[in-house]
């Protein structure tokens, strides 16, 4: 699972063919880079992610990041580079935190990357479950 804010990318080509499982528009009036964020969550397999990581890193703007995880594997994409770490071991985060400093990503972001889905994303995943037949079906909860 991963989160990409569309405004974080110079262009959207690295996301071609990936369909968000959840999307939200957030107003960020105090952000100097983008006052509106299009927050997209993607469920992608590891092979697809690994194939696209270099392109995502090249397209990532300074001051921004994206992140993906599965189990305890955490991948953080920053401008020009991507990093693998263990989500449960903060000592493995130091390299991407330091690099984030160099590309203008504040530590309040890089030191607090969540591997928990927001409730609104969990709800979207439940609504889009492939076994659902119809929202009007009384047997679907």
Predicted features and spans:
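Mixed-charge, glycine-accented linear interaction segment located at domain edges/termini
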Residues: 93-114
């Amino acid at each position: 699972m991963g989160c990409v804010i569309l405004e974080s990318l110079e262009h959207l080509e690295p996301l071609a063919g990936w369909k968000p499982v959840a999307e939200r528009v957030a107003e960020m009036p105090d952000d100097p880079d983008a006052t509106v964020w299009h927050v997209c969550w993607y469920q992608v397999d590891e092979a697809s992610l690994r194939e696209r990581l270099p392109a995502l890193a090249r397209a990532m703007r300074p001051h921004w990041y994206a992140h993906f995880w599965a189990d305890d594997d955490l991948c953080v994409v920053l401008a020009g580079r991507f990093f693998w770490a263990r989500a449960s071991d903060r000592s493995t985060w130091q390299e991407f935190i330091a690099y984030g400093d160099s590309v203008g990503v504040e530590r309040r972001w890089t030191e607090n990357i969540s591997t928990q889905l927001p409730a609104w994303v969990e709800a979207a995943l439940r609504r889009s479950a492939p076994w659902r037949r119809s929202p009007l079906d009384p047997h679907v909860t």
